[in-house]
Each structure stands twice: as C-alpha cells, then as structure tokens.
C-alpha cells in the first residue's frame, strides 16, 4: 500500500491540536512528531558537550508533524487546504503558529511501518503507570509499576498526548475502589486498559469509529486483562447502564453535547473525568457543568490543555 | 493542662487559609473543622430518607473551625483580634467570608484529646495512597495501596488539607524512579513519609519549628520506613546537598523567598513541587519562577488552592 505523507512545519504550540485534528478528523493512519525541544532534552541527558545539535540530520526548526494517509483515498489538495484552514482557526484562538510550511510526499507503506516505530518509546508516566510500545523490552524501576502495552500505530491515544495523560492522573486519584468505568471515545483503548489495570470492576470502551473499536480490541489483547468490553456507540446515546466513573477525552465541543446525558448514566457518588479541553474553551464547559448540577473537584493543566475531575454538586 | 478553644463560624471558603494561619502563625495545638457539607455528604452515603439533617446536634450553618491553644500562653483578646484581622485580609482577596462570629471557651485538655479524634478518619486519597490515623483499623480495597500512618494531632499536615493532597498527587506523577527528595516545611512529616513509601532513595524533611521536627519524627516512627532524616532548617539556607525532587507546601510568600535558591539545590533533570498557593497569588509565583529559569510542567487546582509541578526551562 502506498501512503501520502503530509509534513507540517510550524510552532510546537500546534502539536496537540493539530495531531488530534489530523488523526480524528482527517483519518490519518499515523502521525510522527519531531520537536526541536525533544532533541535538546535528549542531548542534555548525555554529556552536553558531546552532543552538537547542528550535527543532527534535519533538526526541526521547531515542530515537524508528519501525517500519513492512505494514498488511494487521499485528496492531496483538499487535505492541505483543510490543514491550512485549521491552522488559521487555531491562530484565531490566539495560538502562535510560527512560520508554517506544508509539503507532501508519496511513500511506500513498508517504509512508514518501520520508520515511525522509532518515534514511540516507553512513557514512564507516573510512579504506578507506564505505557510501553508492544515491541519494547522494558524493565521498570519499580516492580509494582503497572504496564499498559500498546501498539501506538493503531488509533488515537498513544499515551504521548497531554490530554490522555491528564485522564491517567485523574484516574489514579479517583479509582480508590473497584469501580465500573465507561470510557467514551476510547480510540486506542489506552484509558480503558489503564482503568482495568488500576482495578476497575469492569470497563466499557466506546467509539463512534469502527477502526477505533478494532484497534482498541487489538490493544486490549496485548494486555493481561479480561474485564473490558468495547463497542461502537455515539457518546451516551446507546448506553443504558450507569457507571461509577465516566471518562471522556474528546474535544470540548463534543463534551458539551455529552454533559446533559451524564447524570442519568452516573451512579450515586459517581465521578466524571473530562480531558481534551483547550483552556480558551474551559469557560463554556464550566458553565454547562454548573447548569447540569456538576462541580469541578480538581482542575489539571499542562500547556494549553485542561483536564477536569468532576462530581455532582452536593444538595 | 487547660486549653483555650477559639471557635470561628464563617464561610467554608476560609477553611484552608484560616486553618493554616491558626496552626502556623498562632501556634494552635490543634484544629477541629466541622462543615455543613460534610454532614450532608455523610447523610447521602446512607439512605438519605433516614438521615434528617435537622436531627444533628449543633449542625454548623456553614463552617465551624475550632482552634485549641495552650491556655497559659494564650492572650484571648489578641488571638481574637489577629483572627479578625486575618479574615478581613482574606475578604480583601475577594473571598466570601459569610456571616462571621468568634467565641472563646476554656476546656480541659483531656476533653480535647479524645474529642478531636472523632474528626480524623482514613483519607482514601488515591488508588495507591491512603492516610490512616494511628488508631484506625483500615482494610484497603486494594492490597497494594500504600498506607501513611499518622497521628494527625501532632503538627500541620493531617492529609486532609487540599494543599497537602496536591503535593501527594504531583509526587505520584513525578517519582518514577528512586529519587532523593527534600521536603521543605515538613510539618507532620506526611509528605516525607509519602515520598519514602513511593520509593524515594532517601528523604530529608526540614522545618523551622522544633515542634514540627519532633512531630515529624514521631510520625515517621509509626511507619515502616528507614530512609528519612528530619532536621531544623530555615528553607534552603542551611542545606548543602542537591536533590532530584524538592517539595514545598508552604504559603506563596515563603515560596517566593525560596525560588532564587532552588537551582543550586536541584540535580540535573530535577523537579520541584510547590503547593500552598492561593490562586490570586499565582501570578507572582509564576513570574518569579520564569525569572529564575523554571517552567511549570503541570498546574493543579482544587478550590482556591494551586499546586505546581516545576522543572528547569530547556536551554
């Protein structure tokens, strides 16, 4: 299979938003991110006098995001236009886009399949959680660290995204007993797997995309867990049960659609975790939560991204 | 020993700030907090039709904070004046003080020693951490939850304060390998104990107060840990070593004093956790961090309180 590679050079401020957009909206098969700051940080880990940044081949000016599309279905001109429009929209939010350039290239799938693996490594997320690519041999510093095995090429949620990480942290806080968990927009299944490893009694992961449902099932099979179900569903519309914990890592506008249906799907003393919220969109999410009788227990922010731990207001 | 009990009735918004003030600045021996919302929440855990709030004796209107002082040393009039001034100051920050009333009462120490215990219970803080009063028999839902044993009457840091909890969460995130940890203003020693239980290689806890140093040592002795030292020190002034992780849960003005000395006490790739910051004071902390070449990796907020996970800026 041939692939179309679309390379966007721009400011690192666009990384999360643009990755999200290209994977979720434009159906990219996979995304590579090369950031100047990663090379700088990597250099600092060694004796810095030995690492000359100028010697690195094609060192990115700031951020280089390369998205891979199925060549047969991809409309090159339209993709470039949509990405250009998205960047203009993000600029409208007040983000610094940097000097933007977009280029395209035709590549053989084989190249990509091996090439992108080198950009995914173990994410030593926290004291008790690490995300480990399927092919990596990893020896945790603490033997009781829980490992989430993932084929990060499969769907959104490689563990590297800030929005995913904010949910992981909030789950470590909230999951103090065996709870039932609903993961809306499960993507790669990473959050469903994490919930199970943390001790959820059972987990349902849902996604509107067939590809995500398949990917989540494949990732779940890589992990030693047996209490996760995955099925196709559009937010809470086809869900009948109630849960102790509902997590949703999707964009703010979709969270807004979800909020009115939360109460009827949440057990007594249930909690909700939201992520995927740009800080500029926080006020409207806060307003909708308050109007629906929810309150924010804890707010987490990394860069522009906000995650929320939410509960019903006390009467 | 006789005690002077000073009871402040006011809005729950003052709870953390006023507790901090009375314990740290006015040297209260202990503080009891009774909040209407706690009784409401407790009622909801049972069949709510059976719990009638009106039946509860002396149900607080909103918040009742009772601080206990050594009767011999306490100047009743001056204490009331200082608390009144503090509340006026907090009102100036924009807090809702509610209807404030302050009353004093003389009590026998024996009454208090038994009375306050009923206000401290297990804090099921997170999936992997719980704070357990010395006298409680606790069976965690997850057998690998790490327990911090505490005599919460001893010094500041009972585990119930938001500011303490934000540090606990940030430590769960940051302590991904055996690190050396410095806990500045250790109080009860709770954060030093947590760091050790999470797998720190060694921990130094410091406090400017002799009472806190004694209390921390007593609490450490309740826990099965052997790599914590505690000593009296004024912030970083008497500290020579460098650490992988520095935590400081103290008020914003004291954090500002600390910031210029951080760099020289932090190992390469070291991290810093700050808590005790009222959100109105965040801008000046952010400014001082930026001026000293630090950046905020993650911001956590609960109510008015902010906690920060901090690292050096990449070059």
UniProtKB/Swiss-Prot annotation, chains A, B:
Catalytic activity field: L-lysyl-[protein] + 3 S-adenosyl-L-methionine = N(6),N(6),N(6)-trimethyl-L-lysyl-[protein] + 3 S-adenosyl-L-homocysteine + 3 H(+)
Annotated GO biological process: methylation
Enzyme Commission number(s) = 2.1.1.-
Pfam families per record: PrmA (PF06325)
Q: Which InterPro entries match?
A: Ribosomal_L11_MeTrfase_PrmA, Ribosomal_PrmA_MeTrfase, SAM-dependent_MTases_sf
> Main subcellular localization, coarse class?
cytoplasm
Q: Which family does it belong to?
A: Belongs to the methyltransferase superfamily. PrmA family.
- This chain belongs to the protein called Ribosomal protein L11 methyltransferase
Organism listed in the record: Lactobacillus gasseri (strain ATCC 33323 / DSM 20243 / BCRC 14619 / CIP 102991 / JCM 1131 / KCTC 3163 / NCIMB 11718 / NCTC 13722 / AM63)
* Gene for this chain: prmA
């Amino acid at each position: 299979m041939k692939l179309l590679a679309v390379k966007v050079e721009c400011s690192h401020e666009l990384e999360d938003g643009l990755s999200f957009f290209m994977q979720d909206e434009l159906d990219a098969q996979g995304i590579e991110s090369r950031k100047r700051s990663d090379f700088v940080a990597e250099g600092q880990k060694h004796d810095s006098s030995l690492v000359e940044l100028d010697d690195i081949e094609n060192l990115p000016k700031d951020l280089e995001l390369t998205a891979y599309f199925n060549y047969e279905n991809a409309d090159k001109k339209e993709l470039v236009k949509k990405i250009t429009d998205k960047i203009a929209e993000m600029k409208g939010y007040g983000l610094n886009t940097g000097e933007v350039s977009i280029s395209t290239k035709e590549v053989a799938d084989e190249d990509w399949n091996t090439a992108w693996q080198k950009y995914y490594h173990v994410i030593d997320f926290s004291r008790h959680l690490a995300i480990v690519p399927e092919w990596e041999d990893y020896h945790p510093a603490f033997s009781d660290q829980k490992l989430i095995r993932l084929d990060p090429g499969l769907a959104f949620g490689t563990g590297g995204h800030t929005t995913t990480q904010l949910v992981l942290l909030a789950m470590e806080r909230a999951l103090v007993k065996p709870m039932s968990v609903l993961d809306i927009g499960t993507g790669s299944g990473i959050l469903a797997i994490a919930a199970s490893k943390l001790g959820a009694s059972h987990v349902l992961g849902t996604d509107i995309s067939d590809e995500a449902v398949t990917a989540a099932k494949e990732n779940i099979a890589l992990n030693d867990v047996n209490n996760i179900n995955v099925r196709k569903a559009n937010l809470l519309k086809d869900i009948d049960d109630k849960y102790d914990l509902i997590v949703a890592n999707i964009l703010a506008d979709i969270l807004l659609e979800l909020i009115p249906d939360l109460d009827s799907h949440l057990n007594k003393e249930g909690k909700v975790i939201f992520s995927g919220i740009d800080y500029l969109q926080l006020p409207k999410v806060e307003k909708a939560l308050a109007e629906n009788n929810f309150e924010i227990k804890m707010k987490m922010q990394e860069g522009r991204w906000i995650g929320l731990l939410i509960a019903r207001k006390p009467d």
